[in-house]
Amino acid sequence: MVRPLATSVLALTLGAGSALADVTPAQVWQNLQDYSADYGYQVTGTIEDAGNTLTVTDAVFTMAGETDNSSVTFPKMTFQETGDARVRVVVEGDVALNSRFTVPAPTEDLAEDAPEAGAEAPAEPAPAETVDMTMTGTIKVPGNEMVVSGTPEDMLYEYSYPTLAFDFTLPTEPGQDATIPVTGTVTGLAGSQRNVASDGGMTSSFDLKAAQAAMQIVAQMPAEDADAGGGTLDFQLALTNLASQGTGKTPGQAFDLGSQMAQALAAGMTLDTTVTYDTLEGSFDVAGRDENGQDQTGTGSFATGASDIAFQMSGGGLGYKATTADAKAEMTISTLPFPISYALDQISGEMLIPVTKGDAAQPFKLAYALEGLTFADAIWKLFDPTSQLPRDPASLIVDLSGDAVVTQDLFDPAMGQPQTDADGMPVSESPFLPETLTVNRIALDAVGAKADITGALEFGDNPNEPVGTLNGTFEGVNGLMDKLVAMGLVPQEQMMGMRMMMAMFAKPAEGNPDQLTSEIEFREGGQIFANGQQVK
């Protein structure tokens, strides 16, 4: 629900077709309604059409699903001809947002309602109890202007918002009345969106930029119990040179995206979006008491350099890819005797998840990488005060891909409604049946040791008995073990056992005794061989 709601606010207060011919205020208003309907919104409002000026008061865009309901309300929207074949659109008053959604009830409530010991178990798991949560907010856009040109089938919306300010009230946790305020501003927001009618649906593209964006949370946090006594939170976040581009396509029929997302994707709905920014800076300051009534405090800051985020959604799956450079964080917590500080040259991640149920296997991908990870000396001195371990920047790479059968649409509303077992505890079942897994690379380089693993596995009827091979090379492991013993972190007798275990799975490389190699073979029937020797 968050994505359609956010898209609606942008599209409705921002906007999208090419400047080719006249458009009228009524046609622009109709285009906005059509665009919203394609994303599952119902539109109501009081219309006054004076020909060259159309006024809509109390325009409400509502998306009602089986378990949630969201609305965006515009007090007044004025559509006025400019005299040069275009229409000027202005939003007057504060835009109001309201979103109600259903979440699982707290586990304490589930335990209270669980059947007593010895009671007859139900024939089928009962649906878990749920509670409603509500988010409200307002958006202010003083000095806003949007100019629309083109034709009824191809409209271009060009907008400018000197300042966009938001003020939201968010629930803290299920079953609680406490809320926290979230405020923020976006300055220098400008861009365009184009809506083109196609095949009964609509193809949209957008491009926007903002000089700065900031968000703040300053709140009194509710107490978890009588002893804890609550606390305070001050969270600040700021970004510079924010930009976003993207395209989207809706099919020629309306869907309730809250409960019919799977059907919409199957019908051809797509979304492809990128977000970039130059810098991100943030800080936090928290204070409160723990369960023993002792005061606790924590302060910290974090920052990153240039970041690039991409998101894609279609019937082929959900795709996500992100890269962030020059990340760093520092924090001081009262329960720790030292500050925590670390930095990263780059962090990246990539994910592709199939979402549509089908008999044929579909591709997936999971990748994650940390490059140039360093820690402050205060952390190193805890376990290596004499600097015996190399403190060179560490790195980690995890790159997996494969194919899996999807047994249930991931956007099926039933996926979001947890089931419980006979004891009233939540139960879950994976919607994925893996067929292949390729370990493109798993690599670790830290404290003078390196590990690099590749391989491929295939899965049959029993996913716990794969067939395939994993190959690994390891460097500096023996030297690291020696240093851990010398530092007193691992007793000599325990290290002997670890060396014996390692000898079962790895052997020295020819001509390089400090390099180890390993070939782990998984065979039919669950047998496992390490370097030709059966270990299971």
Where are these regions (language model features)?
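Gram-negative bacterial Sec-dependent N-terminal signal peptides
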Residues: 1-21
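Glycine-rich, small/hydroxylated-residue low-complexity segments
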Residues: 22-536
